[in-house]
Amino acid sequence: MTKWTLGYSYPIALTISLIPALTPAIVQAAPLTPPPATGILDGLCYDYVPKVEKLAPGKDANAQPVEVDADRLEAKQGGTAVYQGDVKVRQGVRKFDSDYAELDQKSRDVIAIGNIYYNDGQITVTSDKTLKSNLDTKNSELEEGKYQVHGSPVRGSADRVTMTNNNQNITLEGAQYTTCPPGQEVWTLKAGSIDIDQTEVFGEAWNASLWLYDYPVFYFPYINFPIKDERKTGLLYPGYTQSSKNGMDITQPFYWNIAPNYDATITSRFMDRRGLMEQVEFRYMPDPAHVGSLYFENLADDKQYDETPSLNEKLSDGHRYLLNARHTSLFADNAMRVSVDYTKVRDRDYNYFNDFSPKVGTQVENQLQQSLMAGYFQQNWNLNTEVRTYQILLASAQQPHELMPRINHNYYHQGNWYDLAWNTEVTRFGYNNTQASAQNLGDAYTGTRVYTAPTLTMPLIDEAGYYLDSQYKLMYTRYDQEVPDNMSSTFTKRFTPEGASGVTLDEGIITRTLPSFRLKGGMTFERNQDWFGGDANQTLEPEFQYLYVPYKDQDNIGVYDSTTMRQDYYSLFSDRRYAGLDRISDSNRVSLGVTTRVYDQAGDERIRLAVAQAFDFVAPRVKLYPSESLATNTRSPLSFEGDAKINEQWFAHAGAQYDMDQSEISSANSALEYRREKLISQLNYRFVRNANYDLSNTNQVADLNQVGMLLTTPLNDQWHLYGGYYHDLDQGVKVDRKVGLKYDSCCWSINFNLEWVNTPDNVTMRPTSERSLGIQFEMKGLGSVGTGSKGTSLDTEALPYIRPFNLRDQ
């Protein structure tokens, strides 16, 4: 309660402090975000909301001078002061008006009547009735009050507002609460009584009902809601979806606020075609440098087990579960970092992610990653180590080698006329023979690899507009390799050259020393030109690279973490043909490329076109596997990349690699996108030769040849349509289809989305079709009910939305 000392030395107490009482919403597991930020119409919806007013930092509101104005002041016998007629009191940002105010100096009671208006910069309260307050007890009571929170759409009314215990305890009787604009009250929460303890996180309401327009739709004998940006134990709103695979899918989360830096969410997920799954997530942050979470979900008995061959042929019963652990720690002023990312499902439960779509885990090419990393980082050197294992989610896939562990050291030094880099790595490669045996795939070779490579880079020319660099590298590798007798047939085939009768792998110590010489240079030419009636700047940037690495036979070395690099413009100017260290390709190659860019007057890049090709003086002889044929091509595919910002709405991208020896395109991608305010539409295409499974014969490969269409567009101020469509042209399969419709008004929204997705069964590799319906209903400022995306995302279950436009500042 604030005591105002007036110029007449008659104090008046006007104690309105309702802000925490007027921000009810659903129980939430994460801090609230200050409104208004509730929809696509914020600028139109909330222009009536008053701004928050505060005194300058360091100023005490109670120490500000008080100004009082009234038509009449009367001091009555007995110590009563009466203010009548247009009473106005001002103190800093505080404002109080009424028709009549009376102060009893003996009882310290204050009464204000008629046209009561109170504004403290954070809330406005009005009433045509009576305000009663006592300066000693600091208790106040207001009849038939209306309130509006500043900086927020929260508003409402109460038949009676009672404030006690120095305004810490507030009771609203006959209360109403909404975030809808005046005259558009689609929903209102009405309660017989609302109690607020401002020292607590949540308020409580009894005999509450939710009204849509003039009709009650839900009744709550009791409900609590947050009044602060903090968390509290309680039920979260349930979620609902309907899918062809799981049937009716209902989730009911319970949030447990264990401590300010520890919490847990316990969710019961009922799927009528599968059973009851329990999900538990525990989050912890003992201090900001140490953060992590543990997540577990368990389905004791999947009702689909007996009816699904890919389950009952691989699992002994219908028990299915997932475990995920994530942790990050920082030490020594963030110079030392430790992280854990571990995800596991039951062994041989290959379709777990297809069936339940958990939102945790790092999954790459149907492999669950399980890693522990630690590193120490300084300005010119770093030392890091990693232990990494995998769980395969594809029944027919070969196990990758595991890092048990990898230790990596990097050193950098920049001199006046040279740069020195030194990379050293020691890796022990293991193999999960147990999991491979469960797949009937046999064992694999293992080994320890030591690699070190000092690199000296010397700029020969470094002038404005052109450069020429030389690079010298010496690469030493040492393997200590073990080759099992019962090696997997997959590896046996890969390491048996055509026409030979045995594998080329050697057991024991193998060393490899290779030098590398690289010469790379480029030039930049510029000219001014006209760009659709405006000035523009065009560049022409030719570049070249010569790379020499001598040949050394490496067929006796296993392939542990290496693969062929993706072919594109940038890979042609790399010093590697293979990613990883197990294969260092011989090279006697010249790469030539040219890029042109167009910049407008504002400096924005509008066009980028690049074309490049590499030419080998001698075709490379190093192969990834000995069973492969020797390369005969002495030139790489012709690579093209192009991007254009046609105007502020239209963007285009195209890329292709053309194999001139085979006279065919090896890969291509393109996209055309239109953007205007909230409208986004995109047509895209991608092609990669021999990069897909043949769905009619899973032992064969097929071309990846897919077209996609995406759209999100407002139909009017409230309705929004969005969707996506992906189709495989080669195999005639609709990969993913999604359509959604969202209604978004100032105080509520509803979102429907329907999706059909074809995903391969990870055991049979046959496509399985899944249909799902998501519904999301939101009463802004109160909470949401349902599942699925609240927004109008262009992501689909199978593929994410990507803007493939490689322009600067775009």
UniProtKB/Swiss-Prot annotation:
Share an example GO biological-process annotation for this protein: lipopolysaccharide transport
Where is this protein localized, as stated in its record?
Answer: Cell outer membrane
Kindly give the InterPro entries that the UniProt entry links to this protein. LipoPS_assembly_LptD (IPR020889), LptD (IPR050218), LptD_C (IPR007543), OstA-like_N (IPR005653)
A cellular component term from Gene Ontology for this protein is:
cell outer membrane
Pfam families cross-referenced by the UniProt entry: LptD, LptD_N
Keyword field contains Phosphoprotein = no
Could you list this entry's UniProt keywords, alphabetically sorted: Cell outer membrane, Membrane, Signal
Cystine bridges:
none
**Signal sequence, start to end:** 1-29
Per the record's keyword annotation, is Nucleotide-binding included, yes or no? no
Subunit structure as annotated in this protein's UniProt entry: Component of the lipopolysaccharide transport and assembly complex. Interacts with LptE and LptA.
UniProt similarity note:
Belongs to the LptD family.
What is the role of the protein in this entry?
Together with LptE, is involved in the assembly of lipopolysaccharide (LPS) at the surface of the outer membrane.
Protein name per its UniProtKB record: LPS-assembly protein LptD
Q: Which organism is it from?
A: Aeromonas salmonicida (strain A449)
